[in-house]
Amino acid sequence: LKFKAPGSLSPLHGIPILLKDNIATKDKLNTTAGSFALLGSVVPRDAGVVTKLRKAGAIMLGKATLSEWCHFRTCESPNGWSAIGGQGKMSVIVLEY
């Protein structure tokens, strides 16, 4: 554990973050935009938003799936379909009253 004076921690210190798979990270997290075409590709640097998140103390836990090519390639594939992650599901629980 790290102990620092109150107010000396960065704004997002230790906050876990999931990034969509189209946001570049220069680490072991693939940036594929949901496509096999980019599997294993290496980006030269973190995206600007990732640099700012890391500087603010956020912890990148992983990548969240998205429709292949951000659903740009076709209107025929089902919403949420990704070659890497399959069909996306809702990430919330719907309660019935």
Predicted features by range, described:
Residues 1-97:
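Gly/Ser-rich catalytic/binding loops embedded in alpha/beta enzyme cores
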